[in-house]
């Protein structure tokens, strides 16, 4: 059994911060669960262009508001508490938080914990290609 406390995780190197977001990685590849689980905050006013070419992601919004735009269709969906979106086709998208948005996310395959988005908006497929994260405050 794995039991972890979010407050404790936020004080470790499992708490990764990058432009527009901070992510507490609660479960990682080394935990052997077959997925990773993150509690991520998307910062108000940011525009997060992402394209997970090597991972599938599902996200549940817990707090905050904003929008997500599907770049293939142009559709824009409202984000608010209780809304879930799943990037089941490696969807290119932009998240625009109006307020800080708190989310719970799962990734398959699991991330190692070091990943931050590359220039294409993806996490690298090979963990050895992952850049070192910027420490969170």
From Swiss-Prot:
It is an enzyme of class 4 (lyase). The keyword Nucleotidyltransferase does not apply. Pathway: Amine and polyamine biosynthesis; ectoine biosynthesis; L-ectoine from L-aspartate 4-semialdehyde: step 3/3. Keywords: Lyase. It catalyses: (2S)-4-acetamido-2-aminobutanoate = L-ectoine + H2O. GO terms for molecular function: ectoine synthase activity. InterPro entries: Ectoine_synth (IPR010462), RmlC-like_jellyroll (IPR014710), RmlC_Cupin_sf (IPR011051). GO terms for biological process: ectoine biosynthetic process. Residues 115-137 are annotated as: Disordered. Its EC number is 4.2.1.108. It comes from the Bacteria. The keyword ATP-binding does not apply. HAMAP family: Ectoine_synth (MF_01255). Belongs to the ectoine synthase family. PANTHER family: L-ECTOINE SYNTHASE (PTHR39289:SF1), PTHR39289. Catalyzes the circularization of gamma-N-acetyl-alpha,gamma-diaminobutyric acid (ADABA) to ectoine (1,4,5,6-tetrahydro-2-methyl-4-pyrimidine carboxylic acid), which is an excellent osmoprotectant. This is L-ectoine synthase. It comes from Sphingopyxis alaskensis (strain DSM 13593 / LMG 18877 / RB2256) (Sphingomonas alaskensis). The gene is ectC.
